């Protein structure tokens, strides 16, 4: 008797949870929701939609976790059309090697644009273009530009995502350049819950010197009708690389 009552109670709880999640799914946010730590996915803001995003990165070197640099970004995104959006970042930073870490300070402005070349699943592989212009707060430093080719292929709830990235100092080739490749796998457990695994590598060239970094890590993304949260950790794979870990969280508010 007790076992039967317990089974009925568990069934009611399960039905209630499924019903609540289904209701949340029907009210999923019209937002640029992130799942990956590093890679951008095939999505832009809907036309006329405004979103506030708060990014927090912890860049931990191999020397000691206390030497980490914390980077905070405040971003406003706006959908110019359903396939083209614009974003403005204000970037702040603090921390670094002990015993003299940098205090909290304004680091840079960044202007970003993204454009989806077609609607989702119209092409064999979804393609999006990304461009970014950065103005460091130190006016003695040159502008920086960044380009991304963003590719995505969906297989039902599963999606494969790849980014090819280039970054340069504007009109200052002597200061070097950076190439990056990101590859991730995303799975939608529920419309409100996604999980992912991601690998990425960066190669920074300055004259004859090359600094290479390799990372692998998991991430999770949850969403409601008004906000979403992404959290992930990338672990350095090469014992000789400078950075040991990247921890990233992004909180988005649909305004």
Q: Where do the model's predicted regions map?
A:
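N-terminal secretory signal peptides that target proteins for export/translocation
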Residues: 1-11
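Cleavable N-terminal signal peptides
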Residues: 17-19, 29
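Transmembrane beta-barrel domains of Gram-negative outer membranes and organellar outer membranes
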Residues: 31-254
């Amino acid at each position: 008797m007790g076992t039967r009552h317990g089974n009925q109670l568990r069934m009611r709880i399960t039905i209630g949870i499924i019903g609540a999640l289904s209701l949340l799914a029907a009210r999923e946010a019209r937002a640029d929701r992130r799942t990956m730590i590093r890679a951008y996915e095939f999505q832009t803001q809907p036309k006329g939609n405004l979103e506030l995003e708060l990014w927090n990165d912890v860049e931990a070197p191999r020397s000691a976790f206390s030497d980490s640099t914390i980077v905070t970004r405040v971003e406003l995104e706006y959908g110019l059309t359903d396939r083209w959006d614009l974003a403005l970042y204000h970037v702040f930073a603090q921390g670094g090697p002990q015993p003299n870490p940098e205090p909290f300070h304004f680091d840079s402005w960044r202007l970003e644009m993204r454009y989806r070349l077609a609607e989702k699943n119209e092409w064999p592989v979804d393609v999006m273009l990304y461009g970014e212009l950065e103005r460091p707060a130190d006016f003695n430093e040159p502008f920086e530009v960044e380009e991304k080719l963003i590719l995505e292929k969906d297989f039902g709830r599963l999606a494969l995502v790849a980014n090819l990235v280039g970054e340069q100092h504007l009109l200052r080739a002597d200061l070097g350049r950076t190439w990056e490749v990101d590859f991730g796998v995303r799975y939608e457990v529920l419309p409100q819950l996604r999980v992912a695994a991601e690998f990425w590598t960066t190669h920074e060239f300055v004259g004859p010197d090359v600094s290479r970094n390799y990372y692998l890590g998991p991430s999770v993304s949850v969403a409601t009708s008004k906000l979403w949260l992404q959290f992930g950790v990338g672990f350095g794979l090469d014992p000789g690389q400078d950075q040991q870990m990247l921890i990233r969280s992004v909180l988005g508010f649909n305004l």
